[in-house]
């Protein structure tokens, strides 16, 4: 009978995987660049509590060794025990499946609605920011506001586990910190990087602020900005503005 001997006293399943994350570099070629998909994977790995390394990739001069590693691939991608994985959605599924309890946190939301909350915002924002026709601006801004309002309503609506059926108190507003509760989930890793871009870019190029009356969104963003998993994986506001300097169209008659 063949026995699989543990290496260095560790069983195979107890060994830490070797993970390297490759993300888009900023304008200086070294710092974290503007890429919500890069930040999404960065946040997932950080929240999982797994040991991993991060390499920023300067797209202007992609190193030869990187082209050999993942030819024709733009970041983000990962290597997991030297195996290259390039599809962001599949990487998310893979990490959730492989880095699982009890050793690692489960990050899937409990409530399916959390996965789709805010999903239309980025498309409406893109149409708004790329438009150059003044006569179309108001309607596009209304479209963006409508999707933000929908997210705000979701964040302010109590989740089932916030409502105590035995309590006499009628809870009308949620006080949760994130989409699915008081802890970040995969849904937040997807939405927060995009929502931050909307906030920064719309202010810079359209002087548009997310209305202060949208208390759910502002509570959500404030809680995100207090977490290292978000702020330390986030590009600087300047990087976000630079990334959109050619994308954001001036309103010209």
From Swiss-Prot:
What's its EC?
1.8.-.-
Q: GO BP, one example?
A: vacuolar acidification
* Record GO terms (molecular function): chloride channel activity; oxidoreductase activity
Q: Which Pfam families match?
A: CLIC-like_N, GST_C_2
Positions of modified residues (Phosphotyrosine): 244
Reaction catalyzed? chloride(in) = chloride(out); thiocyanate(in) = thiocyanate(out); nitrate(in) = nitrate(out); iodide(out) = iodide(in)
Q: Where in the cell is it found?
A: Cytoplasm, Cytoskeleton, Microtubule organizing center, Centrosome; Cytoplasmic vesicle membrane; Nucleus; Cell membrane
The PTM N-acetylalanine maps to: 2
Q: What is its main location?
A: cytoplasm
User: What membrane topology is given?
Assistant: Single-pass membrane protein
N6-acetyllysine: residues carrying this PTM: 24, 130
The family line of this record is: Belongs to the chloride channel CLIC family.
Q: What's the protein called, per UniProt?
A: Chloride intracellular channel protein 4
**Organism listed in the record:** Bos taurus (Bovine)
Q: What is the lineage of its organism?
A: Eukaryota, Metazoa, Chordata, Craniata, Vertebrata
């Amino acid at each position: 009978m063949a026995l699989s001997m543990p290496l260095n006293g560790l069983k195979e399943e107890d060994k830490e995987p070797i993970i390297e994350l490759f993300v888009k570099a900023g304008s200086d070629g070294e710092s974290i660049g503007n890429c919500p998909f890069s930040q999404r994977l960065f946040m997932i790995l950080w929240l999982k509590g797994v040991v991993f390394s991060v390499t920023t990739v300067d797209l202007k001069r992609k190193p030869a060794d990187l082209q050999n590693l993942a030819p024709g691939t733009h970041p983000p991608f990962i290597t997991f025990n030297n195996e290259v994985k390039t599809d962001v959605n599949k990487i998310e599924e893979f990490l959730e499946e492989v880095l699982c309890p009890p050793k690692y946190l489960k990050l899937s939301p409990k409530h399916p609605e959390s996965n789709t909350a805010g999903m239309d915002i980025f498309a409406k924002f893109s149409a708004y920011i790329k438009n150059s026709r003044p006569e179309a601006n108001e309607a596009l801004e209304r479209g963006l506001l409508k999707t933000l309002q929908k997210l705000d309503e979701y964040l302010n609506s109590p989740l089932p586990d916030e409502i105590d059926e035995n309590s006499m108190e009628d809870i009308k507003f949620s006080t949760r910190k994130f989409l699915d509760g008081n802890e970040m989930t995969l849904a937040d890793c997807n939405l927060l990087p995009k929502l931050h871009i909307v906030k920064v870019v719309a202010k810079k190029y359209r002087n548009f602020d997310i209305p202060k009356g949208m208390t759910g969104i502002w509570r959500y963003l404030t809680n995100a900005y207090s977490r290292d998993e978000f702020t330390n994986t986030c590009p600087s506001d300047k990087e976000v503005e630079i990334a959109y300097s050619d994308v954001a169209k001036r309103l010209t008659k």
